[in-house]
């Protein structure tokens, strides 16, 4: 039998060299086109557009070879004639950098730092020989296990359990960390799980077997209190369960683990340990309240997300505490900013109970400067100089409220995450990070040209805060895979922080690794009491019908709604979002305005922005101006309705269902959307949904089955897809029902708050455990981060102007 020869895998550069030899003229033609663009950056879609402009015969020759592969994987091309440097991404999380001399057709490999240095030459005056601070977090993770398969991205806890369960339980000596972990559990001075009668692994196993023997002789329903004293005498305390049956299961899980460890048993056992009683959730910016705030500046999906999150989390915590046989009252505190100028909201109230909960409160702490308390709202882009003092004030308030430390701190968005990092660092508590949106992805080239954005957005400070928090945290929750590592063709939000440069400030050669086991995908859901299917007629909120009728169809034009719908028989295309550039609402209006066929088939209704008051948000002002211009340019009155932001969530749920009654559709046209809560909400009511393929909605929707993907950069195609859908529905009404049902099924399978809250508590337990028993605490990197914070972040934060109080 012939033996197969193992051949060396050629590098990308070597394969490119071979292609250059074979197709010199064709490659030269393309590279010359790119070089002719002059000094600058070409994004992936621009590189592909240039490729499509060369003659078809040449295209065909290049498509199948190494050069075609490089082109398809190129995320950006840096043009500095005669050189073109390429950032090539063969698959998510894997990057290579090349540089081609267009005149000599010479290819060079570049290290990340070399590529970034080359890129910096685009910015005048940055290509000097001075020492540049380079950030590299890779050495701190070099000794730590790292998965390499794409399917492991976002499944960090499973990988961690597999790797470390094998490592931890290999001999008697290695069981000591587990024993110590079980002994450290207590609540307000009351010992849980094990007391000091158990001193070593041998005595633990002996006691567990003794307990197992006893429990197998009693009625499974026997409450723990009946054998509590007996167990205390042998070394076992409360926390194992509320009944003999539950305690026996927990003890058997631990015995199985000690005998033959496996990751599933480990996770199940850790799930049962009483670890989380007090949770702190940080969300400083915006108007955080429960009523009449949605649509205020910086106040949208994140507020809804957190309020839904805490309700589900409290329910799950109460359920677990009961099953653990404890009578502890949990606390969940949402920490946000107290606004003395609360403009008709409850944002000036220190403590506010969360509706539908027993033990969740919003705790508001004001921003302070040297003059005292800051009274007015401040944009999320300008909060940075206040956050260090704010952290100290929050720590003081928490000590008063909780009479102890929290067990978990969850940060939200950039400001919440850096405050969470500082608090977790100070208190030694497990930290979870939720980005919601990383602004670097939303504003292309905002890193290399950061100075252009600085006056308005202060991105240098925000990107530094993001980098600090994502490296400091114990675990990161994302709603989608795309948020971490994008897709085959698009770069993930976190992935975009792998290597980047802020010329004149610092160069990040290794900022984050998307394969890091700290990443976990935990998708949120829609509130099922509000967003339920339009077919559930007995639950429909008919009392809202007159108000919804007024919103949609009234002939009156005022600050609440302008433009009228003349033909009520037509289906409605509906969208609802903040009015900013990234949400791209004006983009959708323009697509509609330009497409005569779409206008003939359907009406368009937009809920965005607040025309009832003067906006303080510069971006919102610009988008409003654009909206008025579009109405005039395309003569939209008669087919279009613009409604000011609607803050009543319960009524909004019924509004979605009324759109379903018209056999309409929901469109989410964002340039980029981290998750897409409105997409989940619309689908949960049965409304067929068309949403951006950039970000989370690409995963929420299965194209053609539970909705449709649209490309915000090709509005004409998106409009044509809508035309195609509504023409199909006109010919066959069951097509609408099919997509509606597909959306409902997708939500039920994957996007519920119950699944979310169970997962969050499981992750807290697992990461808390590994942090204790291994080197997962990442002490070395924390020291590095302290220096980065003190020497870079603090100075950047101080450079942001303080708000002027009138």
Curated annotation (Swiss-Prot):
First-level EC class: transferase
Pfam families: Glycos_transf_1, GT-B_Sucrose_synth, SUS_EPBD, SUS_N
Cystine crosslinks: none
Keywords associated with the record: Glycosyltransferase, Transferase
Key word Glycosyltransferase present: yes
InterPro entries: Glyco_trans_1, Sucrose_synth_GT-B1, Sucrose_synthase_pln/cyn, SUS_EPBD, SUS_N
Annotated GO MF terms: sucrose synthase activity
Region (GT-B glycosyltransferase): 275-752
GO BP terms: sucrose metabolic process
Annotated catalysed reactions: an NDP-alpha-D-glucose + D-fructose = a ribonucleoside 5'-diphosphate + sucrose + H(+)
Enzyme Commission number(s) of this protein: 2.4.1.13
Family, per entry: Belongs to the glycosyltransferase 1 family. Plant sucrose synthase subfamily.
Reported function: Sucrose-cleaving enzyme that provides UDP-glucose and fructose for various metabolic pathways.
Name the UniProt record assigns to this protein: Sucrose synthase
Species assigned in the record: Vicia faba (Broad bean)
Gene that encodes it: SUCS
